[in-house]
Regions:
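Conserved class I S-adenosyl-L-methionine
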Residues: 57-70
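Conserved SAM/SAH-binding beta-strand->alpha-helix loop
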Residues: 90-94
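A short, conserved alpha-helix within the catalytic core of class I
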Residues: 139-155
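Conserved SAM-binding loop of SAM-dependent methyltransferases across substrates and taxa
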Residues: 69-82
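Conserved acidic residues
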Residues: 60, 130-133, 155
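Short beta-strand element of Class I
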Residues: 83-89
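S-adenosyl-L-methionine
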Residues: 1-58, 96-134, 138
C-alpha cells in the first residue's frame, strides 16, 4: 500500500525551486498553489494509486485530464508503476508552466509533457492520435461528463 510520496533530495530540490519560482513569476497563483498541496489533494492521489495497484494492470502511457500542476500524481505514478510517459492536459496556461517547474526532471528526461487545451473541442486530434493506456481525470467535477469526450473521440483506444 502506498502511503506517501518518496520525498527524495531530487524531489525536494525540484519542489522548493518550483515554489520559489512560482511565487516570483506568477504571484497571482499563490493561493491556487497552496490549494493544490492540501491534505485532501494528497489523500485523493494516494487513494487513486492504491486503487490502480489493486487492478494489477500494466500502464505505460498516461493521460492526465485536467491535471492542474500534477506535482503530486506525477511522482506517485512514476515511482509506483512502470510508466514511460505522462501527458498532462489542462485548460489553464499557468498550470502548464507551473507543472513544468514541479516536474522538470521528468520533462528533461522526455517523460512528461504539459499541454494547454480544452479536451472537449472537436479539433483535439493530438488526443485521438495518442496511445494512452490509462486516462486519469481528477478534475471531472469541473467538467462536462466524460462520455462527451468519448462522443467527440470515438476511436479512443483507452476507453
Amino acid at each position: 500500500m502506498v502511503e506517501y510520496i518518496k520525498y527524495t533530495p531530487e524531489l525536494s530540490g525540484n519542489w522548493s525551486r518550483a515554489w520559489s519560482e512560482t511565487q516570483k513569476q506568477r504571484p497571482w497563483q499563490s493561493r491556487r498553489l497552496l490549494d493544490s498541496a492540501t491534505t485532501s489533494q494528497l489523500q485523493g492521489k494516494l487513494w487513486l494509486v492504491n486503487e490502480l495497484n489493486k487492478l494489477d494492470l500494466k500502464f505505460s502511457n498516461v493521460c492526465l485530464v485536467g491535471g492542474w500542476f500534477a506535482q503530486l500524481i506525477t511522482p506517485l505514478l512514476f515511482d509506483n508503476f512502470n510508466i514511460n510517459f505522462i501527458h498532462n492536459w489542462d485548460i489553464d496556461p499557468d498550470a502548464k508552466q507551473i507543472s513544468y517547474k514541479f516536474n522538470r526532471r521528468y520533462k528533461h528526461q522526455n517523460k512528461y509533457v504539459a499541454i494547454t487545451s480544452n479536451i472537449f473541442e472537436k479539433s483535439w486530434s493530438k488526443f485521438r492520435d495518442s496511445n494512452y493506456d490509462l486516462i486519469i481525470n481528477t478534475s471531472c467535477e469541473h467538467m462536462y461528463p466524460m462520455k462527451k469526450l468519448k462522443e467527440l473521440n470515438p476511436d479512443l483506444k483507452a476507453w
